[in-house]
């Protein structure tokens, strides 16, 4: 599971009001090379919840992103930053581990890179 995917997931258990961001418990993280596309990264930047991305990247062992979200000027001119963002969003893969609901503590397993977000009957 890539961090770009993680950034779009939330806990949908009935009654949960703050199910985002899911905390990552990383078991096995791998890197898979992906072609760099700066236009795609710039486009996706507006859709990303920055704090959740930074926390997710750090929990997967990647600490190259700044705490504060960069401004638009950085996105236009700073290619090294775009490459770091590209690496975090698209090249880091959580192969084994869990996603944890911040409100309930419910763990959703991640196996072979696929998060299992299915709910039990009593959670719907």
Swiss-Prot record:
Coiled coil location: none
Pfam families assigned: Trm112p
Gene3D superfamilies named among the record's database cross-references: 2.20.25.10
Summary of the knockout phenotype: Semi-dwarf phenotype. Reduced organ growth due to inhibition of cell proliferation.
Domain of life: Eukaryota
InterPro entries according to UniProt: Trm112, Trm112-like
SUPFAM superfamilies, A to Z: Trm112p-like (SSF158997)
Any one Gene Ontology BP term: organ growth
Record domain TRM112: where: 2-120
GO MF, one example: protein heterodimerization activity
The protein's assembly and partners: Interacts with TRM9.
Record's function text: Acts as an activator of both rRNA/tRNA and protein methyltransferases. Required for TRM9 tRNA methyltransferase activity. Involved in the regulation of cell division progression during organ growth. Required for the expression of cell cycle-related genes, and the G2-M phase progression during organogenesis.
Annotated family: Belongs to the TRM112 family.
Protein name in UniProt: Multifunctional methyltransferase subunit TRM112 homolog A
Species of origin: Arabidopsis thaliana (Mouse-ear cress)
